[in-house]
Amino acid sequence: MASDYSFDIVSEVNLPEVKNAVNQALKEISQRYDFKGSNVEIELNEKEKEIRITADDEYRLKRAVDVLEAKLVKRQVSLKFLDYGKIEPALGGTVKQTIKLKSGIPREKAKEIIDTIKQTKLKVQTQILDDKLRVSGKKKDDLQAVIKLLKEKEFGLVLQFTNYR
């Protein structure tokens, strides 16, 4: 039996689900009456982890964002992963907006999570590994208590627990 148990805390967006949501949003926009005759584009750049939306005017852009958000929620992708850029004028009298997909746990948030875990006085160790955290301890019960605590507290991130050992 292992002497130490551990798990990782990550915050990663599910890119295939985002891609599906973008495709569904494009399909709905092409069929909706209020978008008839307008030019609305939604592009997912998986490498840069961003979504670019281009529309004829600001109103249609906001409606396209609403449709995309609805499709993301339906595909169980949290809107906390989205970081909205400013609406900017684009070529040909159109407007565009870039939405970045946040991935990973920033250092400040990681330190905040570690402080929260330390305040519980549970016998667990927490390490920062790049953009994730590893929590290890001798008892599974302590690790389960940490997971329960982190699920109850709001950090402004979507936390996922993986790599149980």
Curated annotation (Swiss-Prot):
InterPro entries: DUF520, UPF0234-like_C, UPF0234_N, YajQ-like_sf
Keyword Membrane: no
One GO MF term attached to the UniProt entry: nucleotide binding
One Pfam family cited in the UniProt record for this chain: DUF520
Family of the protein in this entry: Belongs to the YajQ family.
Function recorded in the entry: Nucleotide-binding protein.
Annotated protein name in UniProt: Nucleotide-binding protein CHY_1197
